[in-house]
Every structure is written in C-alpha cells, then in structure tokens.
C-alpha cells in the first residue's frame, strides 16, 4: 500500500512539474507575441526581459529592438532607466554611452549610487572578458 501511495505521489509531482513548465513556456510565448506586436511598450518589454532572465535566456535582441523605438532623450524616463539599469550590459550599447555622457542628468533623476553602480558593473563586466582569457 505504501508503495502505491509513493508511486502516485511521484506521478502527481511530475505531472505538476510538467504543467508548471508548460505554463512558463506559454507565458514566455505570449509575452514574445505581445512584444512583437508592439515593441515600443515598456511594460511588456520589462515583463519579457524579466521572464527571459528568470529562464536564463539571452535578452540582447529584445533590448536592441525596444530601444530602436525610443529617442535618446527618452532614455531618462523611469521605465527606460529601469531597463538600462537591469538589462543593458554591453559597454558599447548606445544606452550605456548615453548614460556615461549624461551622468549628471541621470543623477538629477536617480540616485548617484545607482548611476555609478551601473557604469561600474558594465565596465567591470567588460574588463573581465580580458582576464578570463
């Protein structure tokens, strides 16, 4: 009897795990469709970037496509700062260059520590590739 209970428990556990994975993929697929329909929507973009990060998937294409819909002067907006701060990590990205060249403007809107930390993380990440080789 105990074996049957254990077997049923394992089967249910596996079934729930499969359903959770399917929901995760369904959620990602829906977010991708919403993003492709309107790549300028910051809310959908942030949700998609968060989901990609949670699943350990690359996000550079999404970031690049989103920022193609934004003007440089809009990089200072809250939602764009959160995308730059949390998801842009390429030292050569136009957003990082803009941040570097306009640090004082960002510091007027956001914390000096956040701005410096972002720049520091990007530059250290860039330099690490040379130490890894």
Model-assigned labels for residue ranges:
Residues 1-22:
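Classical Sec-dependent N-terminal signal peptides that target proteins to the secretory pathway
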